[in-house]
C-alpha cells in the first residue's frame, strides 16, 4: 500500500509518455476506467486504513515536500490533498539543506510516532536537482 500510493501520487502529476509507461508498469491500465477512478480508489482505501474505530492500528501518511522556488500546479497539489491526504510543504532544499532535512525527518517521526527517525538526508551535491520529495510512512 505504501509504495503504491506514493507512486500513484507521482503518476497523478505525470503526462504523455511518462504517464502511459507508469500506467503500464503499475498495472493501472489493467484496472480500467479513467485515471480519476484510480485516485478515488486510493482515496477510499486510505480513509478505510486510517479509521480510528478498529481493533487494529494501521496508519498511513503521505507528505509532499517541494522546493520553494518551484511552482507546482495548483491542480496537482489540490489533488494530492483530496485523494492522498498530502499537502505540500515548501522547503528550501537548495540553500538550507539542514533545515529541510530536519523538517522532513520531523514530519516522518511525528507520523510514525517516533518509529522512523532520520530517514532522509539531503546531500549538498544533489540539492540543486531536488524539485520535490514525496514521503510515505505506515505504522
Curated annotation (Swiss-Prot):
Endpoints of the signal sequence: 1-20
Keyword Signal: yes
GO cellular component: extracellular space
GO biological process: activation of immune response
Residue spans crossing the bilayer: none
Gene3D superfamilies referenced in this protein's UniProt entry, alphabetically: Antithrombin, subunit I, domain 2 (3.30.497.10)
GO molecular function annotations of the record: serine-type endopeptidase inhibitor activity
UniProt cross-references to Pfam families, sorted A to Z: Serpin
Entry keywords, A to Z: Glycoprotein, Protease inhibitor, Secreted, Serine protease inhibitor, Signal
UniProt tissue specificity: Highly expressed in dendritic cells and primary leukemia cells, especially those of myeloid lineage.
Compartments where found: Secreted
Positions annotated with a glycan in the UniProt record: 50
Family the UniProt entry places it in: Belongs to the serpin family.
Record function comment: Putative serine protease inhibitor.
Protein name: Serpin-like protein HMSD
Species whose genome carries this gene: Homo sapiens
Gene encoding the protein: HMSD
